Amino acid sequence: MSYNGIGLSSAKGSSTSGYVQQSLAFTNRKKDPRLTTHDKEQQQQQQQQQIQPAKDESVISHKAKRQIELLVSEYRDKLEDGPDDLSDDTIDSKCEDYRRSILEGNEQSRSQN
């Protein structure tokens, strides 16, 4: 009464006939044409995602500016939390100098490339 080890060894006392039915929830991906076309489409989408277009120059420059502002913000936090009691004007001027030095460093590295 069992099929491939599935089912009851004996239907006696189980209140069933012991008949084993095929699971309708199981689908064979290789035989179902709807699923194979979906898989092909998914593979094509993954391949298209791997081939990325050239990034826009404005996006790259914006990310670089954000990175610079992050460094300046961390520097400002360090100055504000430091043991020296600096005024806001002094901190602002030091942050501006730091920002200019970073920008000059970036321009020099671009001119070398």
From Swiss-Prot:
The alphabetized UniProt keywords are: Cytoplasm, mRNA processing, mRNA splicing, Nucleus, Spliceosome
**GO process annotations (BP):** mRNA processing; RNA splicing
Its main localization is cytoplasm
User: What segments bear the compositional bias annotation Low complexity?
Assistant: 43-52
Q: Which GO terms describe its cellular component?
A: cytoplasm; spliceosomal complex
- Renumbered to this chain, region (Disordered) spans 1-61
- What are the annotated disulfide bridges? none
Tell where it localizes: Cytoplasm; Nucleus
- Polar residues bias: where? 11-26
The signal peptide here is none
Q: Residue spans with biased composition (Basic and acidic residues)?
A: 29-42
UniProt domain CWF21: residue ranges: 60-105
Pfam families attached here?
cwf21
- Function recorded in the entry: Involved in pre-mRNA splicing. May function at or prior to the first catalytic step of splicing at the catalytic center of the spliceosome. May do so by stabilizing the catalytic center or the position of the RNA substrate.
Q: What's this protein's family per the entry?
A: Belongs to the CWC21 family.
Subunit (UniProt): Associates with the NTC complex (or PRP19-associated complex). The NTC complex associates with the spliceosome after the release of the U1 and U4 snRNAs and forms the CWC spliceosome subcomplex reminiscent of a late-stage spliceosome.
The protein's name: Pre-mRNA-splicing factor CWC21
The species this protein was found in: Kluyveromyces lactis (strain ATCC 8585 / CBS 2359 / DSM 70799 / NBRC 1267 / NRRL Y-1140 / WM37) (Yeast)
Cite the source lineage. Answer: Eukaryota, Fungi, Dikarya, Ascomycota, Saccharomycotina
